[in-house]
């Protein structure tokens, strides 16, 4: 594997999970579905998203695919939707307590507050848009649950988002899998996908850091929780 890709944290490298010597090895379909469900349903945002689905699509386009695209694409879309339903009802269950959870290695309070701001800005369309934004796609369904967004509305928009993201990115990898340039530059393409997908989160983190540095030292305003 190239230096560029090995420079990525292992957990964000799709081949760490799906490679011949990866965590899941040849079990590509179960591996992808497990990771998608953990990221979307169990509030663990630090996993590969678009790069994993794109890689799965590429593998399904190989001469001896570990899984066919006709099975992979709908299964990913279905599990993505099921994961969001889980996250929505977690939000309904725990409510505003999520905003008070202390930071840990894999959880930062600003993940929730920024997802809440994203939700407030775009409303119900957030359910679709957040699918393509790492971290936001993990926490926006929870925020929808905390906000008691009407479930039929959430479900409808989530199905659209789940199909667009889960099946769409996977199909993109499948159809581009026959392009020689993609095969020759696979590692760099995956690195680019990871970078582009993380860019919004990096920009947001930079803004938060700059705002904290420039803010006067005073007691922070209390967070207004969704109704």
UniProtKB/Swiss-Prot annotation:
Membrane spanning stretches: 27-47, 63-83, 126-146, 153-173, 186-206
UniProt keyword Cell membrane, yes or no: yes
Keywords, ordered alphabetically: Cell membrane, Membrane, Transmembrane, Transmembrane helix
Protein name: Uncharacterized membrane protein MT0380
Membrane topology value: Multi-pass membrane protein
The organism's taxonomic lineage, starting at the top: Bacteria, Bacillati, Actinomycetota, Actinomycetes, Mycobacteriales
Stated family: Belongs to the DedA family.
An example Gene Ontology CC term for this record: plasma membrane
Compartments it resides in: Cell membrane
């Amino acid at each position: 594997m190239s230096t560029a890709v090995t420079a990525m944290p292992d957990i964000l490298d799709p081949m760490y999970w799906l490679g011949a010597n990866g965590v899941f090895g040849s079990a590509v379909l179960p591996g992808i579905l497990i990771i998608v469900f953990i990221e979307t349903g169990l509030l663990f945002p630090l996993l590969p998203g678009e790069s994993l689905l794109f890689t799965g699509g590429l593998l399904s386009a190989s001469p001896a695919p570990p899984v066919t695209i006709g099975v992979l694409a709908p299964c990913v879309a279905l599990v993505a939707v099921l994961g969001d339903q889980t996250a929505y009802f977690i939000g309904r269950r725990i409510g505003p307590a999520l905003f008070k959870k202390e930071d840990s290695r894999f959880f930062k309070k600003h993940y929730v507050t920024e997802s809440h701001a994203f939700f407030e800005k775009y409303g119900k369309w957030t359910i679709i848009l957040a699918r393509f934004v790492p971290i936001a796609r993990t926490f926006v369904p929870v925020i929808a649950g905390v906000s008691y967004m009407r479930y039929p509305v959430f479900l409808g928009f989530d199905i659209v988002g789940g199909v667009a993201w889960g099946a769409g990115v996977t199909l993109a990898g499948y159809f581009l899998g026959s392009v020689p340039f993609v095969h020759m530059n696979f590692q760099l393409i995956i690195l680019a996908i990871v970078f582009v997908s993380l860019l919004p989160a990096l920009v947001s983190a930079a803004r938060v850091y700059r705002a904290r540095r420039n803010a006067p030292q005073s007691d922070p305003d209390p967070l207004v929780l969704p109704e």
